[in-house]
Amino acid sequence: MELINTIKIIHKCSGCKRKMHFVNTGKFRVNANGSRVDVWLIYQCEKCKHSLNLTVYERVRPSRISGEEYRLFLENDETLAVKYGNDKEFLKRNRVEFGK
């Protein structure tokens, strides 16, 4: 899996059992639950490759997401992954620390 060059984050890794650096995979996960949709940006522990999903949208109606952006999520658009991966407000909302 190719990793994207964005802000590294620090989070407790469930595989390593301690705080580790995580990197952006450039992949999104989209999950439909009835009439609602969840979208996550997937990060990965640099050491053990455990994944961490950062919430982009949670339990929203698909009509609240622009058709173009929704299509880009489904296509794992690298440019969109970089945009979210460098958005400090997005990262803060997901309660992660910024890496060095």
Which residues fall in each region the model found?
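Cys/His-rich microdomains that often coordinate metals
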Residues: 20, 52
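Short cysteine-rich clusters marking metal-coordination/redox-active sites
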Residues: 11-16, 45-48
